[in-house]
């Protein structure tokens, strides 16, 4: 199991956030690659708990040579939201100054996807590890 810490610059001077990535299983491009993430909605913690326990099971499977896929796991995908606590309550999905919900107001990507072959090409690129 390989653990990688990814540093993301914060939006104010001197701040940064960490994402942890785990790569588990054979590094064989012919095998399926499975991406798992949890904690995108920072206040929703059951997925993080599941991945916490799954990591131990996958590590045991890797050590015994039983895994037939490569797993890429981000057990907590929203470090900004996880760090937002006010008055002893988790505020994870709201921008503290504006009150905007981080889980809403996303760009409409339909046009871009339609012009570039839809999700099929995106999925193929993600599974192949291509950065194009």
What residue spans do the PLM features occupy?
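Structured catalytic-domain cores with a bias toward divalent-metal coordination
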Residues: 1-132
